[in-house]
Amino acid sequence: LNVNLMLGQAQECLLEKSMLDNRKSFLVARISAQVVDYYKEACRALENPDTASLLGRIQKDWKKLVQMKIYYFAAVAHLHMGKQAEEQQKFGERVAYFQSALDKLNEAIKLAKGQPDTVQDALRFAMDVIGGKYNSAKKDNDFIYHEAVPALDTLQPVKGAPLVKPLPVNPTDPAVTGPDIFAKLVPMAAHEASSLYSEEKAKLLREMLAKIEDKNEVLDQFMDSMQLDPDTVDNLDAYNHIPPQLMEKCAALSVRPDTVKNLVQSMQVLSGVFTDVEASLKDIRDLLEEDELQEQKLQETLGQAGAGPGPSVTKAELGEVRREWAKYTEVHEKASFTNSELHRAMNLHVGNLRLLSGPLDQVRAALPTPALTPEDKAVLQNLKRILAKVQEMRDQRVSLEQQLRELIQKDDITASLVTTDHSEMKKLFEEQLKKYDQLKVYLEQNLAAQDNVLRALTEANVQYAAVRRVLSELDQKWNSTLQTLVASYEAYEDLMKKSQEGKDFYADLESKVAALLERAQSLCRAQEAARQQLLDRELKKKAPPPRPTAPKPLLSRREEGEAAEAGDQPEELRSLPPDMMAGPRLPDPFLGTAAPLHFSPGPFPGSTGPATHYLSGPLPPGTYSGPTQLMQPRAAVPMAPGPVLYPAPVYTSELGLVPRSSPQHGIVSSPYAGVGPPQPIVGLPSAPPPQFSGPELAMDVRPATTTVDSVQAPISSHMALRPGPAPAPPQPCFPVPQPVPQSVPQPQPLPTPYTYSIGTKQHLTGPLPQHHFPPGIPTSFPAPRIGPQPPPQLQPQPQPQPQPQPPPQPQPQPQPQPQPQPQPQPQRPVFGPQPTQQPLPFQHPHLFPSQAPGILTPPPPYPFTPQPGVLGQPPPTRHTQLYPGPPPDTLPPHSGALPFPSPGPPHPHPTLAYGPAPSPRPLGPQATPVSIRGPPPANQPAPSPHLVPSPAPSPGPGPVPSRPPTAEPPPCLRRGAAAADLLSSSPESQHGGTQPPGGGQPLLQPTKVDAAERPTAQALRLIEQDPYEHPERLQKLQQELESFRGQLGDAGALDAVWRELQEAQEHDARGRSIAIARCYSLKNRHQDVMPYDSNRVVLRSGKDDYINASCVEGLSPYCPPLVATQRPLPGTAADFWLMVHEQKVSVIVMLVSEAEMEKQKVARYFPIERGQPMVHGALSVALSSVRTTDTHVERVLSLQFRDQSLKRSLVHLHFPTWPELGLPDSPGNLLRFIQEVHAHYLHQRPLHTPIVVHCSSGVGRTGAFALLYAAVQEVEAGSRIPELPQLVRRMRQQRKHMLQEKLHLKFCHEALVRHVEQVLQRHGVPPPGKPVASMSVSQKSHLPQDSQDLVLGGDVPISSIQATIAKLSIRPLGGLDSPAASLPSLVEPPGLPPASLPEPTPAPPSSPPPPSSPLPEPPQPEEEPSVPEAPSLGPPSSSLELLASLTPEAFSLDSSLRGKQRMSKQNFLQAHNGQGLRAAQPTDDPLSLLDPLWTLNKT
């Protein structure tokens, strides 16, 4: 009864809910029918006699009520069934259901008499509804539908839908019956005894765990020190298989079997077109030269009175043809360099491509394999076995410890304790603890075995050391070979593309050159006819005088030489273009030293985009345009027998052509330069002889035509030469005729000056620049600068003239503002303005051929002015001998200076010591013999006569004395060898590489190993000296500050720069992926600030490897790498500390304001109280100390990894005054904070670990901090003030949105201006725009403290002093690899007084070796007594410098040793080329006299 009543009431609730929710009528009817069923069951229970007797009187009332509910809910069910019939348009059924519902409701109303009013109201409401529905349905059916009304029992009965179910009840459930009152019937004494037994078990466990932990700690430390990974100890199997990446390349080539064939065919076609173009250009040149020669002969025949033949139109057309020819020649020369490099690259890669497309067995054979003896393999196996034992011991120990813990945990003897007497408890404990004895024995045996295992491991590791070294070297070779093969595969497509571009380019050029050749032929024929006509007319007038003949002495020999060289070529070189086979373009030191080939933008039209580095090669020559009469000595110059060496040619124009922005070589050589074997004269002639047949070219600066304009900025390789051992230049083996002068005539006036055309044909008239020196005086020239050289400005020297009045001279050009030159600079000339302080003097005047004065060159990075007064006085006359001294220091890869090898055997010659430019006054007749380099090979521009000082006539009485030099003939070398070397260089011969010496050729031995040549990655550059000690630097900084101030001064410029940066960011971001960061959206604070996949920080030991942090590198050589990250979220603090631990970070910079900390916008991820460490995952962070300054809070934290006893300290620097939406209070605070950060960074070792920087999102304030940090370091290092937008773009290429606000950029600009002003004030220079007047004491008090105050005055923190000292550091010369970095320590300010340098005191060096020595001698050390030494820097000028000199980075025994490289571990581990007992002895080293091997590794 109760169950059914309750179920019916529950079903009623569901019925009411369904009706309120307007469920379907059929569903409501079924629910209502189920209510009827439940109440019918209850009614049956009420009719049960037992129940009736139990209830008594109320049984009738209950039954009546239940029956009323049955009828009522049946009426509801039939009402909704009627609605259902209405929806189905069964109108007869609708009337039947409504009739039934009305009947049942009437029954319910009868049974409801005596019920409360609420029930009566409900029934009345139901009657209204059902009655209304019934009447409406009946009328509709009667009058409209006329459907038959079926009987109710013929309709489908309504089945109930039970939606409720009864839940069973457990009578003993504690929730029903309450807690069990009999649960605690164990006696209290038994509980106490059980507790005592538990303590005994815990004591036993603690004792064993302590022993295990001690042994584990010893084992971990031992294994960490061994650095032996069992997985990688024996990975010899990896070398027996071809790596997957190489297999992919082999598979790709196997489906293209014609790869190499197509490449070779394409290059052969290109060579053919190249040869055709060169032949056509040569034909045009020969036509023009022949025409000019005939013209000269005609004028000599007819005299000056005879007018030139032919109409002026023909001459103008010929001039136009000549210009077109010069233009096409220049384009051809520029393209020929790319063509040569393309062939070199093809020859380099074609072997690798053949290998990759061949059988896999050959590929596998080409990879290095381990060469291990059986003994080595036995050592390996032994080590592996012992390492396996160590691992087995560990596993067993862990297993036994786990068993012990589980056994103790499960041991419960309460049942025994209840039945045991209290006096017997101890005895019971002892018996029960005996069950652990077996496990204790096993554990102690395991611990005891550790010492034996470690002893055996130590012995095995000692034997493994040699094998380990062999395997590591093998791994390096394996990776290197792999990279070379993959690079060759990747270069193939680019080679084919460039080859096709070259063919298209040369096809276009060929058509134009062919048209020009036809035009030149027709014009020359017309000219010849006109000349013949004029000659015939003149011959009729008078008898013709005998025509002078001008033989062409060496032209045929040159052609024979070319043919002979071509026959000498090896088979693989015969497809090279002719200019590569025509003999060496430069002396062999040039081979393999040019800049690496970058194809784009090259001379081929349409070539864009960067391309692969290819093998660097020699500088190609200018097209041969020398005269037919080769360097004939003038009568004014005395001749004497004995060969003379010519200087190696420099590929710069002698005609005043302005070089392009980055010319590789293609400037047309002077038509007046001698070509071929030299004439045996004492000195070069003072001016070109008149017999030259070269045309008087007036070259324009690159006429703008379609063909030339397609040659966009050519490859930047002009004079970018890398020093290194290289073979000596080949010398010709044929004898040279020795003409003997008939007489020594008096000095003659200089010939008529040639006219040069520079730029827009402003003719500079006057004699060729010559330099005259008194007789017998060793001529002093400035030493070649070591390091990047500023190119010479137009500063011609005044020339002596025989006439009383001076002729017009070229005016000095105004010096352009210094601009940074990405291209390597041309080399410095021997004459012209020179800085007065020479850091490294040499006695190699013949090794440094000069440029001609008057050649426009790109503006230098640092301007300088000549110092005519310094060292202008000639030293005492002394005839000293010249010997090849030690070669110059190795140069940085981008240096413009050219070290040449010493030529052959030493020759005694008069000294040409380098010094400042000499006084140009001629003091009388003179003939100073000059030692110059051997003959340039054919088809190569030879040096102009004024490349090396030559004896020149000057007015004065008496004959010109001559002193013939005793020169040894150079050793004969096969000239073809140089051409064969074109492809002999290796991938190391790119920038910074070394070239192995050739057999039997002298070895260049650098006195320093350039850091760029080392394979290791460069660390942070230190600033070891104050770069602003020189006034020139401060003056340059002032000028830069003036222009920098206005860059972002107004809002318009700032908006424009910001717009460009935003557009560049969108462009750069399209090519970079952030797919990994998107997978970890919960770890990103902002969904638009995520790291790029390419440079994100990868966690190595976390649950996953992701953290929102990016590596930001390459902002400045002096700025450490940074990790920009967001502030840690509550769930990523463990990742943050794990990154700090894995990256070995020592400095964390936090740029979050105090307000953000107080509002708890930033989760505290570091402890703030001592003794309260925070645990993040496996790492524990504790606070060691806190120091609060005016600008920041400095916390020293200790980081400890779980289960390790070693702790690591790091510094947490918090800058609290930078609000989230704003700027710091002043730039000064941030600048001081940056100095503090850098000082802390310099304290760590090593210096290549990053600094972690974070703000809120890791891009806004973090970006501004990184930008200003890098810019400040650039200024402190003495580099130019950096371009902030470029730095911003570089940062954003590594992390999007770095420097989020435009205001941040403006703030950084203002802060950098402020910092530069402080640097200037620190050195006593007022910033630009401020008065220079002496400041009063009150004014001085407002300036920043000077260096003395920083050390001695005030309460300056020690970190500030250390930061200042750190700013005085600089990497030594050998470590520099960029011009900008090395210039600060090399360029001398122009304003030094003349007394700052000692006068040169030439002294004779030691006597020479016998001149007949057939082999090259090693360079002689200490042969530089006649060269002025650079003045020492003197003692430190202030306490700050004294303190700076005592830092570990800058300490040395003598202040003059500053700038020398510190000794490090690498100095003892790396071999040094060219060092040994022959190295120069440092005279300023007080310990150098103790042991001759003292300086073996000293750099």
Curated annotation (Swiss-Prot):
Sequence repeats: 788-789, 790-791, 792-793, 794-795, 796-797, 798-799, 800-801, 802-803, 804-805, 806-807, 808-809, 810-811, 812-813, 814-815, 816-817, 818-819, 820-821, 822-823, 824-825, 826-827
EC number, UniProt record: 3.1.3.48
Disulfide bond positions: none
Residue spans of the TPR repeats: 75-108, 199-232
Region of interest (Disordered), ranges: 536-583, 718-1006, 1322-1351, 1381-1499
Region (20 X 2 AA approximate tandem repeats of P-Q): 788-827
Residues annotated with Phosphothreonine modification: 994
Molecular function GO labels: protein kinase binding; protein tyrosine phosphatase activity
Domain Tyrosine-protein phosphatase intervals: 1055-1315
Ranges where the record places region His: 598-993
Low complexity: compositionally biased ranges: 1427-1450, 1482-1499
Free-text function comment from the UniProt entry: Plays a role in sorting of endocytic ubiquitinated cargos into multivesicular bodies (MVBs) via its interaction with the ESCRT-I complex (endosomal sorting complex required for transport I), and possibly also other ESCRT complexes. May act as a negative regulator of Ras-mediated mitogenic activity. Plays a role in ciliogenesis.
Protein name according to UniProt: Tyrosine-protein phosphatase non-receptor type 23
